[in-house]
Amino acid sequence: MTSVNLSYPIGEYKPRESISKEQKDKWIQVLEEVPAKLKQAVEVMTDSQLDTPYRDGGWTVRQVVHHLADSHMNSYIRFKLSLTEETPAIRPYDEKAWSELKDSKTADPSGSLALLQELHGRWTALLRTLTDQQFKRGFYHPDTKEIITLENALGLYVWHSHHHIAHITELSRRMGWS
């Protein structure tokens, strides 16, 4: 039996050197499907299951769902800033502190699921209009001190989505919920 890394069930993110138009198109399609896959992973869970951490010391399923909404809202804004400003410095946020706010710990996930559905609809509509040149635009991340291109950010957020959905589905598998 293969052991799953509970922190990184799909492995760590590895940026690509070059990204083809076909790869970007595939990622956009995947990003569009994320809200439905997340909803499918959590829609039949009880409150007790939603409040179960995906690993010791990890977030609960509920916190993961709300984190995805928080994170992807920030990413969408970063894309818009990068398209309208010259290499903007983004404002990082403390995702751990956000996950400890009461709404992240207690709110019904349905609000974040609905938000993600609409957000990903807008985000992918925007992404489908971008030229290769626009995908080369980027933002400066002061924590990593790097410029992140939009095409690499797209790949990162596809990975981020799969990463957290895998936290949930792997927990469900281990607990015998699915």
Curated annotation (Swiss-Prot):
Broad class of enzyme this protein falls into: hydrolase
Species of the source: Bacillus subtilis (strain 168)
Cofactor comment: Binds 1 zinc ion per subunit. Is able to bind nickel instead of zinc.
Taxonomy, superkingdom: Bacteria
Pfam families, per database record: DinB_2
Subunit-level organization: Homodimer.
Binding sites annotated in the UniProt record for Zn(2+): 67, 160, 164
Cellular component, GO annotation: cytoplasm
Protein name in the entry: Putative metal-dependent hydrolase YfiT
